[in-house]
């Protein structure tokens, strides 16, 4: 599905209405095994994905399917407890939709976590890895989206 800028704005406004003056500076997308980190957020405001217009729902097992807004480690954050996946039938634009909406709310930093395997024998279970690149074997890029000016989702201007 191709979303319009008005749809992104409508989603962002629905979140503003729930959050009052709170604005997250960082979006944390929690992957498998880390969903409980959302329970550590101070002064949490939980918003189920189904309460956000145009947002798809996570159907993966053990994914709560909600945002948690508040403070974590002294930072104003939005936490996604349960991400969206293409294997659930969602498009790349569906999967990246919440990132663009949160950018409209003011999030400037994105941290994505996941459970991953490695072929490097120097790695041990529980090691932290920094992803610096990716291999895209699909025909469509998850970065593909309409280009908008100014503070629009994904804009660098």
Please describe what each predicted stretch is:
Residues 1-157:
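Metabolite-binding pocket within alpha/beta catalytic cores that recognizes anionic/polar moieties
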